[in-house]
């Protein structure tokens, strides 16, 4: 009886703390949209421009840097 009560309380507690992921896709799309807007706003280098060490800034617009922006 005590074990049953403990299990019920634990399940209720975990259910109350569970993450609501019903609109997870919507939130993910919103986050990607915000990242794209920030990428457009900041200064970035076009493809073919030297990037990376020893020149860490500015970043490549594509997000890929292999000694030159991809």
From Swiss-Prot:
Entry text on domains: The presence of a 'disulfide through disulfide knot' structurally defines this protein as a knottin.
Keyword Disulfide bond part of the UniProt annotation: yes
Stated family: Belongs to the conotoxin O1 superfamily.
Entry protein name: Conotoxin Qc6.2
Record has Disulfide bond as a keyword: yes
Compartment annotation: Secreted
Residues of the propeptide: 19-40
Cystine residue pairs: 44-61, 51-65, 60-69
Gene Ontology MF term list: ion channel inhibitor activity; toxin activity
Signal peptide range in chain numbering: 1-18
Tissue expression summary: Expressed by the venom duct.
Origin superkingdom: Eukaryota
């Amino acid at each position: 009886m005590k074990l049953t009560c403990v299990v019920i309380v634990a399940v209720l507690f975990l259910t109350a703390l569970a993450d609501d992921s019903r609109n997870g896709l919507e939130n993910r799309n919103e986050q990607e949209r915000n990242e794209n807007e920030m990428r457009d706003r900041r200064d970035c280098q076009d493809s073919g421009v030297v990037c990376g060490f020893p020149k860490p800034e500015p970043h490549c617009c594509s997000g890929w840097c292999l000694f030159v922006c991809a």
